[in-house]
Amino acid sequence: MLKGAITALITPFDHKGAIDERAFCDFVEWQITQGINGVSPVGTTGESATLSHEEHKQIIELCVEQVAKRVPVVAGAGSNSTSEAIELAQHAEKAGADAVLVVTPYYNRPNQSGLYKHFSSIAKAVSIPIIIYNIPGRSVIDMAVETMRDLYQNFNNIIGVKDATSRIERVSEQGEKCGKDFVQLSGDDCTALGFNAHGGVGCISVSSNVAPKLCAELQAACFHGDYKTARELNDRLMPLNRAVFIEPSPAGIKYAAAKLGLCGETVRSPIVPLTESTKKIIDEALSHAGLLKA
């Protein structure tokens, strides 16, 4: 089962904006040595929206090869076109990914019947597990719990959700409708602790790009019922969780990674580099977490 801290991986670029393959592979290796529980390439944080399909596939292949089955690879495979989502999911399966993360279609705003058709079509096209990515703030639609339940009950390879609704009560609602084996992962670092307390089993995390050890320790503390330690770790991470989203993501987390010497901070337009004031806040948050010496 997918659980724990799963990093929503950034995609390092060189100063010209091309994929930095060496930096990416080194970054993935560092994540594993730090104790991360899984990695998720080419999602929102990986700037999938500004990657070509060829680049998207390239990153998945690099990630699968570097990970070499040591932790699960949950590959992004979303699109607002069902046929494109199927193509990306099939490629991820062929490349050796352990699961795919499929976002609810954005911009075209399908109704619940359209959402069911979209995900059922993908489920029929691949055999690997599918995680529904429900993020109304970006896709402008919210998959109803009943739609999620129907998909889960009717397709064996639809196994759970990355919930980025920031509505903590959804964990209980989804658990009640879908059952205890439905995999619920938080999509928001700020709610990760409470999410687990309500029945979640982990977080697909942005902050773990720079704090994989702390995020994995927080998740482990939750699993062992040690919420005192989990709260202490959460308090260390919370300023960072907030700071990296002051300006449009992933500029914030890429700056933080660059500050720690993990990769460059280049982002692709229309995302732009951070202002100096936000950089200062992130520096302070990194120091608060114990990741950056004052």
Curated annotation (Swiss-Prot):
GO molecular function, one term: 4-hydroxy-tetrahydrodipicolinate synthase activity
Catalytic activity: L-aspartate 4-semialdehyde + pyruvate = (2S,4S)-4-hydroxy-2,3,4,5-tetrahydrodipicolinate + H2O + H(+)
Signal peptide: none
Site (described: Part of a proton relay during catalysis): T44, Y107
Broad class of the protein's primary localization: cytoplasm
Catalytic residues of the enzyme: Y133, K162
SMART domains: DHDPS
Residues annotated for pyruvate binding in this entry: T45, I204
The name this protein goes by in its record: 4-hydroxy-tetrahydrodipicolinate synthase
Organism for this UniProt entry: Bartonella tribocorum (strain CIP 105476 / IBS 506)
High-level lineage: Bacteria, Pseudomonadati, Pseudomonadota, Alphaproteobacteria, Hyphomicrobiales
Gene: dapA
